[in-house]
Amino acid sequence: MKSVTLKLVIVLALVGAFAAQTATAQQHPPAKELLLWQKLDTFVQSENRNLDGVLGVTILDLSNQYTLLLNADEVFPTASTIKIAILAELYRQAQQGKLKLTDTYTLQQSDLVGGSGICNALTPGVTKLTLRDVAALMISVSDNSATNILIDRVGQENVNALLDSLNLTHTRLRRKMKDIKAAAAGRENVATPRELTQFLEALYRGKVLNKQFTDDYFILLSTPKSSYIPRELPEDLKIANKPGELEGVRNDCGLVFNGSRPYIICAMSTYVRQERAAGDAIARISGETYRMFDRLSRSSPYGRVVSPRDTSAP
């Protein structure tokens, strides 16, 4: 499969027709850098062929907008990855003065649902948490009870309004966590790899929150967690990500703060027969992506390494 260079973006690894991009000027990556992108393209395509399921990937270089796309506009179940949008709406309402992250909430018996998390081990009627604490549980251990508390607090319709304001029309919060009846009726939380990437990029570029809330948003999203993107990456590298898992579904989407070459990677899979294989594929794609960006961030235009590994935020 060939690759093409479009306006301000290099688009690789698409199944079928290439997606059109609009911009005002033409920009091409240096020839040797293009070869690295092509090698990454080949790697991603190989993982896609070997996976017994459907895989979608978007990789965005935040320093120059070069992008790799595989099934990037296919709609996938988000599982817990949708929680990055719930978190953003919480922070947006805090910025607007509609709530404070330090507001407290008393855990109720009716809040408790199954699945991942630790709220079920806490004492209802007694346990008090700040809204930021509730958000931390939602992100760090993917607590479904905590997530539903926040959905009630910020409003499902407001999460979708935020997505609409960014023209993300395929990314939807349609139900609470563990609402099996809603899922069976087809009200699934969904997104595309491209739109989740665009969502994180909008946050990174300050288009959703001011600097104070943007910084804290990514601090919370960078909480270490069991996930796929960091598995093959250095432990001291800042990674703001949120995985998601359902039966037949494995996802992970995040921003890797790789010094002068930060990037976003979003990988989603569905119709997966072997979930472990899908998670392993996402981890390998993430590892190969990091190794390319690490070389680019530390090398001269000729490829000679001229600086040590940089894990600082740009």
Predicted feature locations:
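Bacterial N-terminal signal peptides that target proteins for export
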Residues: 1-10
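Structured C-terminal helix/loop/strand segments within mature extracytoplasmic catalytic/sensor domains
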Residues: 26-50, 153, 198-227, 234, ...
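Mid-domain, small-residue-enriched loop/turn segments at the edges of structured enzyme/sensor domains
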Residues: 54, 127, 148-200, 204-205
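Acidic helix-start/capping segments at beta-turn-to-alpha-helix junctions
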Residues: 62-63, 101-119, 154-155, 220, ...
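Conserved catalytic neighborhood of penicillin-recognizing serine enzymes
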Residues: 112-148
